[in-house]
Amino acid sequence: MIAETIGWPQIAALLVLAQRGAEELYSARNTKALLAAGAQEAGASYYPVVATTHLAWIASLFFLIPATAPISIVLAIAYLLLTVARYWVIGTLGRFWTHRIITLKDAPIIRSGPYALVRHPNYVVTIAETFLLPAVFGAWALACIMTAVWTAVLMYKIGLEDAALAARRQPQLEPTG
């Protein structure tokens, strides 16, 4: 019975859930430290939408993809490379990486690592992951639907983030390296 309901899609969903749980702990620690240092949170009301969307994506992987779904090794490798990119983003931001929009007045705006290539690399990775993981298991409709939902949610978050950072994007505050 378990073998018929638990397969690679469900294992992948549980691994992603564990990974995101660990990231949430790191984010919460960074958030607490930044707020203690005088940082401000912007757009706090959007956060439950982001969290719910993310959990819905993980749940859809677990419940909507058959346990016996075929696996595309090429897409699985691409997804694993995105995981490396995710941790490159997290490592580049270090103590400033959070799930929430937290701004610390005199903190530098990071322009190194993936931020030298793309303005919002974490969101690019998230959207690509949202599409790729269901696609690994041939769940193309799920990949398209959840990617569209995530894209809408993240576009809203990007607007909030850009507005929160606008005052800090003055040329004299931009680091050179």
Model-derived regions: residue spans:
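Long, highly hydrophobic alpha-helical transmembrane signal-anchor segments
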Residues: 1, 44-73
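Hydrophobic transmembrane alpha-helical segments in integral membrane proteins
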Residues: 2-17
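N-terminal signal-anchor/start-transfer transmembrane helix
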Residues: 13-27
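A short, structure-level motif marking secondary-structure boundaries and short turns
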Residues: 15-16, 60, 147
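Hydrophobic residues within the alpha-helical transmembrane core of Major Facilitator Superfamily
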Residues: 18-21, 59, 131
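Cytosolic-biased juxtamembrane loops and peripheral soluble domains of multi-pass membrane proteins
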Residues: 25-46, 70-177
